[in-house]
Amino acid sequence: MARNYGFCADHESETVKKTAASKIFDTARDLFYRRGVRAVGVDEIVCEAGVTKPSLYRAFKSKDDLVAACLKESAREGSEAIHAAIAAAGPDPRDRLRAVIRYYADKIGSPDFRGCPMTNVAVELPEPGHPGRAVVEDCKTALRGLTVDLARDLRVTDPEALADGLMLIIEGAIATHHIFGSQGPAQSLTVTCDALIQSHLERRMA
C-alpha cells in the first residue's frame, strides 16, 4: 500500500528539533539498508522520522551526503568489530585471519542480514563521483589491505592471492545469501576459506 506522506508534521517541537538530525540519520540508515538507497526518497525519510524536510537539509546538505554519512558509520562499526575479533583471536596468525572469516560467517547467519551495506551500495551507485561510492571504495580497499597483512603474517608465498581469494569467497557468500539464505552456499564460507588457507600453507612448505 502506498504511504500517504500528507500526514507528516508541518511543525516541529523544540524536542524534535534537538533530536531531528539523529532521528533522520537512524531512520535513513535503516531504510537504506532494508530497501536500498535508490528506492528511498527524502519524503519517506522525514515522514518515518517524524520531522520536516527543512530539518533534513539543515543537518545534511543533500540526500547524497546523508547516504555517505550512513555508510561511514557502517564502515566504522564494521572496522571496530573486525579489529576486536582479530584482537580476541590471540597471537596465532591463522587464528587472526580466521577471525575475519568468522565475523562474516556470523553476520551472514544473523536473521536480519540484508547483505553488506558497502556491496549493496556499490551496485546501486556505479558513478565514481558519488560521495557514497567513495566511502564504499575506501572501506573495501581498507578491508583488502587488512586481509593482505593478515595473510602476510602466515608467511605464505603469495599473500595477495590468498587475501583476494578469501575476499572472493566472502563476497560470494554474501551475494548468494540474497537468493538462498544462510542455509545455501553461504554456509560453506568457513570451510571453503579454511581449505584455501591450507592450500597456501602447503604450497609454502612444498
What are these regions (language model features)?
Residues 95, 110-131:
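Amphipathic alpha-helical segments used for helix-helix packing
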Residues 72-79:
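Short, basic, alpha-helical segments at the C-terminal edge of helix-turn-helix-like DNA-binding modules
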Residues 1-19, 201-206:
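N-terminal intrinsically disordered/low-complexity leader segments
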Residues 69, 83-112, 153, 159, ...:
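Hydrophobic alpha-helical connector segments
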Residues 43, 120, 171:
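Conserved acidic functional residues
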Residues 2, 23, 27-65, 69:
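Helix-turn-helix
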Residues 131-141, 152-206:
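Hydrophobic/aromatic-rich alpha-helical bundle segments in the mid-to-C-terminal region
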